[in-house]
């Protein structure tokens, strides 16, 4: 069913994590050729010659047009600028090339950011030292999700679309930059954990905007890919200190290793996302 088809995962590093999982599964059958990458290897495309199947990951962490001042390690040199009324041409210009897409937003919207509309700054999130209108991240997130889904449902090109919901992290006793960790070794049981307020706020926006878009989608190309609850129950599935190989090798004993309690180990819980995605495709 995927012969001569193309599929793209559009979004942030969770989308990249997801496509890495799918690559691990697919390469057990056929080894692909890497046919494209951007300068930073964040957007990439692979081609499976026997299946004539093309798989891409498109780096667009805000889904909106933005200017980001970060190096490869995620260290920011300035505050990012988001244009809330313009989608990111990085994915919009390539949308017509894809038969299937998975798209979603996430934790990048928590970052301090300047917000623009009509090329004019309208406010800022999390920058009290600036003499600007204070806007919550939910303002930008709703704009991004609303514009993204409207573009997809109104486009003449009808890519079958999985709209992925947000993924909660499992940092405990701090955040990624304040000593938070994730050392649990078993999943949570049902009812043992609940979403925190910021994740609930994101999820509310996602479900509301998806419902509006689905109601206007006459071609029925849009599907909700709800990974939030699945992710919430798996605090045991993160790389922790092993986001890079040999994290403790040659390290100063007094220097802490940064932990990753957001992304997923491979193999790991994220592999189930691909099982669910394939099941949804087969039942269409």
What are these regions (language model features)?
Residues 1-284:
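A compositional signature for long Ser/Thr(±Pro)-rich, low-complexity
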